[in-house]
Amino acid sequence: MHRRAFASSATLGLGATALPLAGPVAAQGGTAPRPTTLGGAITDVPGIRVGHFTDTRRPTGCTVVLTEEGAVGGVDVRGAAPGTRETDLLDPSNLVEQVHAILLSGGSAFGLDAAAGVVRWLEERGFGFPAGPVRVPIVPAAILFDLGVGNPAIRPNAASGYQACEAASAGPPVEGSVGAGAGATVGKLFGMARAMKGGIGTASVRVGRVTVGAIVAVNAVGDVIDPASGLVVAGTRTVDGRRGPGAAAAILQGDLPPALQPGMATTIGVVATDAVLTKAQARKLAQMAHDGLARTIEPVHTLWDGDTMFTVGTGRSGLPGNMMVMGVLAARVTASAVLRAVLAAKGLSGPELPSVPAASEIG
């Protein structure tokens, strides 16, 4: 069977079926079919709540994935310019087993301050790792670079993280230009003048009694590609502003990009499951989730990206995870979340902002 036909098959093994895929429809403003993606959201995983804070002063914000009661955490960092917090603690050889939230934030390294607000929110409610007379909330975090969009002095802080927690819900989170995806852009190998809008997206799939979901803030230096067709969904535009064949195609034709500053991009996300995981399994699942980034972003894991994927396992199903199956699902939901992020995004325009169209706005 052809690889793509197999990938879109409803049957994924273990006698169970995946959630149906959305059918292709005509893309707004163009003739290419809309990419096929999984439905659902990371909040379909029991024990997961998500909240966004979106700054109204410029496009930036943060997104919190709450696991207040504790979840086994893992992480895998593949980009060369990451900005992270508490990732060493997720090493399987280290002590603490569970995390209480994961924060994704804009604002580059400044945005890591938002994690302090998440910690305060959790502490006020008595959640955290028991350490003598106190409970210490464990909140790993990762950031993306959006300081080139509007006033760079405006970035997420502790109050932003706290507000994201206050907004958290078990319902489907809003996608597109919100939270950590508010200032995200993609297709920047040839500069912001030819870029398109990124965003944040989510998806999930259930096999048997186990659910796997993802949420991804897409701010890649590379292009977002539909893996089924190989076409650019959102990415480097032509010099005259049209949807182009992509940065990789341009490079192959000898059109080399200018020098870029490391850390100018970064895609970050979380994969969640209700399966029972060990820390080693959680880390492996985060590694396999990066396959979803590699299928939908080209190039990915570059010197200019700090691509980071977290995993949280709530264990609510009470079932051990089949790592082969869950790795397949983690890559699939991650890929779908990437596509949904740019499909739901809204373009940038206005005073002090670059003009950056979204996928829905150009042919």
Residue ranges of predicted features:
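Boundary at the C-terminal end of the N-terminal hydrophobic targeting segment
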Residues: 27-29
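N-terminal secretory signal peptides and thylakoid transit peptides that target proteins
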Residues: 1-14
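Active-site-surrounding "flap" and adjacent substrate/cofactor-binding loops of secreted or lumenal enzymes
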Residues: 119-122
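A structural signal for small-residue-enriched, beta-sheet-centric alpha/beta enzyme cores
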Residues: 32-109, 113, 124-363
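Solvent-exposed, non-transmembrane regulatory segments of membrane-associated proteins
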Residues: 17-19
